[in-house]
Amino acid sequence: MHKHLHHVSHTIKSYLSTLIALENLKVVAFLISLLSCLVAGSILLFTLYTSSFHEVLGLSYLQINMISSLSALGMYFCLPVLGYLADSYGPALLSLFSIWFFCPSYFVNSYLVSTQSGSVIGFCVCFCFIGLATSSLYFSSLITCARICPDHKGLAISLPITCYGLSALLGAQILKLPYFHRHDVLDLEVVFSFFAWLYLVVGIASFVSSSIVIVESELLFGVTPDEETALLELTPTRSLEPPNHRQRFVSFVKDPSAWILLVSLILNIGPMESYQNNLSSILKHTNGADLPNQVSIMAASSTGARLLLGVLSDYSSKYVCRVWLLVVVIVVGVAGQMSETSAILNGVSYGGMFTIYPTIVASIWGIDIMGSTWGSFMVAPALGSVIFSMFYGRNADSCSDCLSHYFYTTAGAMIVSCIFVLLAWKIWYARGFTRF
């Protein structure tokens, strides 16, 4: 299959190159990838479906949370495999995955709603595939951007991450349109059908844009095939696999600094995910601030931090190591946890982590195997979210008016994570990575 995929991708690139100059083609591919990220976050709108699931389809909240949990598993636990496939066969394969899993899943969901089916298993399977498709489209776009602009890793990584962060805000506004509502609740049949057709179009566009990365891969790996060489004979196996991919990935897995950094990410992102998931309960038991406003503030702060830190990390990397930017982001997060209700500080820290961490990973282990390396790190949000959310739930159930113990614990965990980051940096410094 890899030969045929490479052949199709190379044909698309060759045809487009006759119509558009290479530099302009790269710009178009970059913009399409950003657009893909901008609409990739439909799964982040799951909370908007809850009332329709409960009131229209009669699902219990336990059943609804089972569906949500399966979507998270689909998103996070498949990322290491998706990353390895992207490095081996190119991000175009992930774009195809997004079409294969998004469209049938949303169409089946639409059908289940139209028949008033309460099939929890059906919804669980579909949303698990939707989570997988979300990661496929997002990762394909992220890797495409990173490979098109390898000299500006911070900006190339922060822009798609920023667009993905905005996708929830954009989707929430779109779903306010009367077209998507019936009897003052979301018409899930219409919503799911809309997303199925949307992702068919976006998936095809993403496949075209990610095919252009082949040009960058050939230049990066020194592959300059003769025009008369048959495209299907360019390579006998993985046509886009970086040099020594398997050995480098094994070295990454055996690298103590990788595990140290992973632990730090779990201790960092766990409190942030838990805060975001339980913001309604936190506000209820503290200052009672307006939930929609606080959600908007956190989302805007996170998005702004992703974009700002992406630019800042690129232009300051010659003078200041990105590790110190990460330390600042962690300190901001500690302050946010100690304040308990500061959506701004927690949003800045949350967005900053998802910008600085992948940039550091790309700098230390190489941008050409970033799919495998950063994909492996994506188990951290799943583990961290479960650990700290369960801890919050137990604390809130036992003593709803004394959440200070929870926040002291999360702040302490983030301080410990900062120590782990510095330990990893000490290892990198000894290897010669003084500024990156």
From Swiss-Prot:
InterPro entries: MFS (IPR011701), MFS_trans_sf (IPR036259). One of its GO terms (molecular function) is transmembrane transporter activity. The chain crosses the membrane at residues 27-47, 66-86, 93-113, 119-139, 155-175, 188-208, 249-269, 295-312, 325-345, 347-367, 373-393, 410-430. It is found in: Vacuole membrane. GO terms for cellular component: fungal-type vacuole membrane. It is a multi-pass membrane protein. It comes from the Eukaryota. The keyword Glycoprotein applies. Keywords: Glycoprotein, Membrane, Transmembrane, Transmembrane helix, Transport, Vacuole. Glycans are attached at N278. Belongs to the major facilitator superfamily. Probable transporter. This is Probable transporter MCH1. It comes from Candida albicans (strain SC5314 / ATCC MYA-2876) (Yeast).
